[in-house]
Amino acid sequence: MSNTHVPEPHETNEQRHPTNQSRSKVTYNGLASVISVALPIAMYFIFDKDRFKEDPLLRFATILLPFSYSATQYLFLLYANWKSNYKPEDTLHKALYYSFNALLIAFATISILSIVALPIDGWGSRNDIVIHSVILPFFVVWSAYLTFTINCLIMKTIRLTDVNFCMLIALMMMIRIIVEFKSSNREYRYYRQMPTPMFRDTFLPTIKRMVSILTTMLVLATFMYAFIAWKCLIFLRNM
């Protein structure tokens, strides 16, 4: 008997091209997220309290990048869901699908309104400056970045490469380093020595875990954006 050679299936350039494009988008998305968080924090350390209180343009520049990033990411995800071939069949999946899209619309709308409303409202205290230049940019960018990345992973358009995951961990560590460096140099040395690959090795990106992370993050993001919307409504009511 003669052995018959059966050619193994392989990916064509056309099949690999969309995946490479998706990986590039996630890489650029990660860089944009780091810049969107780092710039407001840098402005917090560069300018003093009185400058923030007196200059509305400075307040506008502080929140423009993170909230623009947030609105762009949620609108992009909404557009991707609308263009996808996924059509929920049963009632439960339809409810989850349309609820997710409704959250994306709400988050994008609140982000756009915040760019207009939050800078006009004077940041009178140091706590207000910290909230608007450190806390809100971090959580706004973090939630949008995680939603984008995990959604791509669940849809299997990319793989969780070392670059993408280390960028995600670096984003979280960078915020803690910058915020705590001002008060304790010992904390900075500790975080600097934390091995990022350790997180990668212990984190298993299963679909079930990613869905649970996405669900938890969306719940936290809902409360956060509700707080932002409440601040915007109070300001608009007092105008």
From Swiss-Prot:
Region of interest (Disordered), residue spans: 1-23
What protein family is recorded? Belongs to the UPF0328 family.
Report the superkingdom from the record: Eukaryota
Instruction: Give me the stretches of Basic and acidic residues compositional bias.
Output: 7-17
What's this protein's name? UPF0328 protein ECU05_1660/ECU11_0070
The species this protein belongs to is Encephalitozoon cuniculi (strain GB-M1)
